[in-house]
Amino acid sequence: MSISYFMKKIVILGSTGSIGTSTLSVITHNPDKYQVFALVGGRNVELMFQQCLTFQPSFAALDDDVAAKMLAEKLKAHQSQTTVLAGQQAICELAAHPEADMVMAAIVGAAGLLPTLSAVKAGKRVLLANKEALVTCGQLFIDAVRESQAQLLPVDSEHNAIFQSLPPEAQRQIGFCPLSELGISKIVLTGSGGPFRYTPLEQFEQITPAQAVAHPNWSMGKKISVDSATMMNKGLEYIEARWLFNASAEEMEVIIHPQSIIHSMVRYIDGSVIAQMGNPDMRTPIAETMAYPSRTVAGVEPLDFYQLNGLTFIEPDYQRYPCLKLAIDAFSAGQYATTAMNAANEIAVASFLDNKIKFTDIARLNQLVVSKLQPQKIHCIEDVLEVDKKARELSQSIILSFSHP
């Protein structure tokens, strides 16, 4: 039997999150193709417990020690054979485990950074859903991919759409493909514009967390939903796209597409535009990366063209979306700026969801942190973590000076 028919063993970093649960959904549609080798989460014991009973992984790991002990006890009571581990070191070791064929890197935030890098350095097939790996460690990350010859496949719907719209030569050179030599003129990132694209600007101060997490098209976690509302999500994706596709500022274009049917596009020098379309369901890009270069069932409804009420495109308004402009400018400023902005944004969004700051304070805080932090060169992961720490501390102190909503 050909090796291509062997079941692929997958490690899911962030299995209890939105991308993780969608990945497990794809696996349930392909039980003969994929085997869950390890599940990794934060502290959601109950969901991890259910996932372990359903998928019977060899390993499960939680970042939180107390949560891991609770999980181990619950699994033992159910005669589960899954070995439970705890802490960052164990998670990094699972990400690089010799038995793993592929690693879904879907831990949200800076917490996913080291495990994702571990998978890359081990030369794994890495299905990249963690934005921070490229936002905070762009050059270091791409250099590690090149050195280890890891296979990097983008899961984010936009980057996956771009990936699918590229020629095979570019797909084989993620991180260092020469766009112009391959006849590519522009990478076009699309975004819905979030739930407030038509809300009057004077009402932005009154936006509540409940309103901000109600995304019109996609089912996402709270943090990413707020990032979509501010378009910081698109800003982070802009930074990622520049690294993933080796694109200059002139080779990038951001367009608001409210229907989220076209997930992104690639312009070619002959005037062609190749777009990837589909229903807004993360299982499509997840399945594409898992099966690449083949295709597999994802459990997604086919796109019904007769139900579409037209496709529209709008130029981004930076007054409405200052976070998008900040991200574009931060890339030009350097790695320290994108790292600081990302850290500040994590604190800002958490504070907004906790009703500690206003919606408009998110962009305000991000801008203040980037402008106040001293520029510095990033040479290694320790430098990244240092900037991240400084930016978080600065963010917390600035928030104290904000008047509460």
From Swiss-Prot:
Annotated binding of 1-deoxy-D-xylulose 5-phosphate, by residue: K131, S157, E158, S192, H215, S228, N233, K234, E237
Regions annotated as coiled coil = none
Matching entries from InterPro entries are given as: DXP_reductoisomerase, DXP_reductoisomerase_C, DXP_reductoisomerase_N, DXPR_C, DXPR_C_sf, NAD(P)-bd_dom_sf
Q: Enumerate the residues binding Mn(2+).
A: D156, E158, E237
Protein's pathway? Isoprenoid biosynthesis; isopentenyl diphosphate biosynthesis via DXP pathway; isopentenyl diphosphate from 1-deoxy-D-xylulose 5-phosphate: step 1/6
- Is the Metal-binding keyword given for this protein? yes
| Entry keyword Ribosomal protein | no
Q: Which UniProt keywords apply?
A: Isoprene biosynthesis, Manganese, Metal-binding, NADP, Oxidoreductase
Q: Which GO terms describe its molecular function?
A: 1-deoxy-D-xylulose-5-phosphate reductoisomerase activity; manganese ion binding; NADPH binding
Reaction catalysed by this enzyme:
2-C-methyl-D-erythritol 4-phosphate + NADP(+) = 1-deoxy-D-xylulose 5-phosphate + NADPH + H(+)
Which sites bind NADPH? T16, G17, S18, I19, G42, R43, N44, N130, E132, G221
Domain of life of the source: Bacteria
* EC top class named in words: oxidoreductase
Give the record's GO biological process terms.
isopentenyl diphosphate biosynthetic process, methylerythritol 4-phosphate pathway involved in terpenoid biosynthetic process
EC number of the protein: 1.1.1.267
> Which SUPFAM superfamilies does UniProt cross-reference here?
1-deoxy-D-xylulose-5-phosphate reductoisomerase, C-terminal domain, Glyceraldehyde-3-phosphate dehydrogenase-like, C-terminal domain, NAD(P)-binding Rossmann-fold domains
**Function in brief:** Catalyzes the NADPH-dependent rearrangement and reduction of 1-deoxy-D-xylulose-5-phosphate (DXP) to 2-C-methyl-D-erythritol 4-phosphate (MEP).
Protein name according to UniProt:
1-deoxy-D-xylulose 5-phosphate reductoisomerase
- Lineage of the source organism? Bacteria, Pseudomonadati, Pseudomonadota, Gammaproteobacteria, Pasteurellales
